[in-house]
From Swiss-Prot:
Function: One of the proteins required for the normal export of preproteins out of the cell cytoplasm. It is a molecular chaperone that binds to a subset of precursor proteins, maintaining them in a translocation-competent state. It also specifically binds to its receptor SecA.
Domain of life: Bacteria
Protein location: Cytoplasm
Pfam families: SecB (PF02556)
Spans through the membrane: none
UniProt record, GO biological process: protein folding; protein tetramerization; protein transport
NCBIfam families: PRK05751.1-4, secB
Keyword Endoplasmic reticulum set for record: no
The protein's assembly and partners: Homotetramer, a dimer of dimers. One homotetramer interacts with 1 SecA dimer.
Protein name: Protein-export protein SecB
Keywords: Chaperone, Cytoplasm, Protein transport, Translocation, Transport
InterPro entries cross-referenced by the UniProt entry: SecB, SecB-like_sf
GO cellular component terms, A-Z: cytoplasm
Length: 162
């Protein structure tokens, strides 16, 4: 036994894959209730439409920004009750991954981390707008990523980070 630290183990940790969440923040947020206050006097029979999008951007070095955009439109009958949109973003330190793992991390793993924050922001806005709570169902980002990857392969495209 020696009192000297194992420098080889430290070197391996520094050179191996690394993932670290640096910051989560709201990049953009909006809420519109175009038919209020009249909409509050109507029978509530909502239909919900959800649009979801992600984008990634390499910042300096091994830092990446991932932005998850959720747009929710709720109609009551033929009228728009409300529209809410949130861009939930995160900055991640990611290094030591091959291209496939990096693409999956940015396209599925990071959005999965951001989704609960976006869902909570949307629910809070809806309730503050005096509408019933809107708890969005979980999203399978791995399946969405696999579908997008298949679509890109069929189109002859390759995933890129801007």
């Amino acid at each position: 036994m020696t009192d000297q630290p194992n420098n080889g183990a430290v070197a391996n940790e520094e050179n191996g894959p690394q993932f670290s969440l640096q910051r989560i923040y709201v990049r953009d947020l909006s809420f519109e209730a175009p038919k209020s206050p009249a909409i509050f006097r109507q029978e509530w029979t909502p239909t919900v439409s959800l649009d979801l999008n992600t984008r990634q951007k390499q910042l300096e070095g091994d830092f990446y920004e991932v932005v998850l955009t959720l747009s929710v439109t709720v109609n009551n009958g033929d009228e728009v009750a409300f529209i809410v949109e949130v861009q939930q973003a995160g900055i991640f330190l990611i290094k030591g991954l091959d291209d496939g793992a990096m693409s999956h991390t940015l396209g599925a793993f990071c959005p999965n981390i951001l989704f609960p924050y976006a869902r909570e922001a949307i629910d809070n806005l809806v309730v503050r707008g005096s509408f019933p709570a809107l708890m969005l169902a979980p999203v399978n980002f791995d399946a969405l990523y696999a579908q997008e990857l298949q679509r890109m392969q069929e189109a002859g495209e390759t995933p890129t980070v801007q």
